[in-house]
From Swiss-Prot:
Residues in Radical SAM core domain copies: 100-339
Cofactor: [4Fe-4S] cluster
Species, as recorded: Shewanella sp. (strain ANA-3)
Binding residues for S-adenosyl-L-methionine: 168-169, 200, 222-224, 301
Protein name: Dual-specificity RNA methyltransferase RlmN
EC number: 2.1.1.192
Any one cellular-component term (Gene Ontology): cytoplasm
Amino acid sequence: MSEKKINLLDLDRKAMRALFADLGEKPFRADQLMKWIYHFGVSDFEEMTNINKVLRQKLAARCEIVAPEISSYQKSTDGTIKFAIHVGEGQEVETVYIPEDDRATLCVSSQVGCALECTFCSTAQQGFNRNLTVSEIVGQIWRVSHFLGFAKETGERPITNVVMMGMGEPLLNLANVIPAMDIMLDDFGFSLSKRRVTLSTSGVVPALDKLGDALDVALAVSIHAPNDELRDILVPVNKKYPLQEFLAGIRRYIAKSNANRGRVTVEYVMLDHINDSTEQAHELAQLMKDTPCKVNLIPFNPYPGSPYGRSSNSRIDRFSKVLMEYGLTVIVRKTRGDDIDAACGQLAGDIRDRTKRLAKKRMQENQISVTMN
């Protein structure tokens, strides 16, 4: 039985250099190889013309460059593209490309499903199967870049920003997310600015501290409620890491960070008559008074079976005006890709749910139906 080949997309520069040392090669050879992979999108060692033939043969014998494949894609009327990415065992995660005039953002997944149970999120209702590997995370960027077209002559990449806001909670997969983001930031990797790579979290506080010790990227935090009582329902991880503990962790992170320029982005999904009253806006402003931030209000994007509705424009407007009275910077996110279920909270993929969450939900619904009948 032949030995399994090393997928080079799993290796950050430190690991890549260690591999080359094991091959008896100098560190700069690893840098050359990474440039071929991430700047020019090359996966065939024979195309790497500044690497000698003997080394190319060694690499071909021991290594491979394999990104997950695109199973299908849908294009929105606004230009947003949602990709279904095959990650084995019949499972898919979803990745979303969002083009704008001044940037091109890719929303990347970190898990097959999600282990958290946020009640307004479609991904959470699908359950959880496993963490994505480094190659499956960076492979989403690599594969979509291929789809959009690497600039072979200049090395210019078609993606300018990456947000870890797809399927999954990134802080529950730190072992793979940290090296993946290292590759995104590395000059020989995707060469993105730390201000153009954003990680979004629902508040796994110990892992947030570990992230802050490991690297510096922009941080977005999913708050979604102005108090623990409501957040316990909407974002159940709050029962383990309540708001004040989460906010203290956020302040520790931004104290270390240059990428955040001294403040964090607060994400707040607007749920009709659930968390969108003017009283709750005052409460949110008071909650955030000691945590430098800008607030991103996200109109809820319904999905089949969702128990919530989207706040009206007038309620969102009143809510935002209250926050601005406190001197907060407020942005109402423009919904992108909702006609193809690619908007915030709508990603579902195709998941073999190890948590059996959907099955349990259906059983509960059947029990309720029997009781009512």
